[in-house]
A protein has these predicted regions:
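Serine-dependent carboxylesterase/thioesterase catalytic core
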Residues: 2, 34, 44, 49-73, ...
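Surface-exposed acidic, glycine-flexible loop patches that form ligand/cofactor-binding
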Residues: 23-28, 113-117
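Flexible, charged surface loops at secondary-structure boundaries
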Residues: 26-30, 169-170
């Protein structure tokens, strides 16, 4: 599975790189698209030691530092992985607030994918605060725009997740929520 990075900033929305069009054209019909959304405290794209250069990294020559695509078994010929990078730095409160506008940007990206790649199923994977971005994005999408959602250690209040789960997009897809005790405070409200 090829990997394309989508940069998001509050002012201009998601920036679709030129290589995305090339990667989409090279896909076989029905090949999956997998959108990876990181969580709290990842560096901005202009910072040199950005951790998501590791977690979103395609398969390396050595296997000591496996990124999400390789750990998920996403081979280069299977489909297209899109890493959605958003500003989740600063205090937890500030990053939590940034999740809402990032969700709007993610929804725009997914709507664009629905237009330019309508025959490719989309899976969203959100980790930690990235799960809030994913669930909030579902609220602005049409039915069947997403096939699967995987939430890993979601940082999203239960009430907000339940509201998002009632959206047409959420009703038309499978949602898997992998939990841990580390985020139990978010399950209360």
């Amino acid at each position: 599975m090829a990997l394309v990075t989508i940069e998001y900033d509050d002012c201009s929305g998601p920036k679709l790189p030129a290589q995305m069009g090339v990667a989409l054209k090279g896909l076989r019909p029905g090949a999956p698209l997998c959108v990876l959304v990181h969580g709290y405290i990842l560096a901005n794209p202009w910072e040199r030691d950005c951790p998501d250069t590791h977690i979103f990294a395609p398969p390396p020559d050595n296997t000591a530092n496996l990124g999400w695509p390789q750990r998920l078994g996403l081979a280069h010929d299977v489909g297209l992985a899109l890493s959605f990078r958003w500003n989740a730095r600063g205090t937890l409160r500030a990053a939590y607030r940034q999740a809402a506008p990032a969700a709007v940007g993610l929804a725009r990206l997914l709507a664009a994918l629905e237009q330019i790649a309508p025959n490719h199923p989309v899976t969203l994977i959100g980790h930690s605060l990235g799960a809030r971005v994913v669930m909030r994005a579902l609220e602005g999408l049409s039915a069947r725009s997403v096939s699967n959602v995987i939430l890993l250690h979601a940082v999203i209040p239960r009430s907000e997740a339940e509201r998002a789960a009632q959206s047409p997009a959420a009703q038309g897809c499978e949602i898997l929520n992998v939990t841990s005790h580390g985020n139990i405070l978010f399950d209360i409200g």
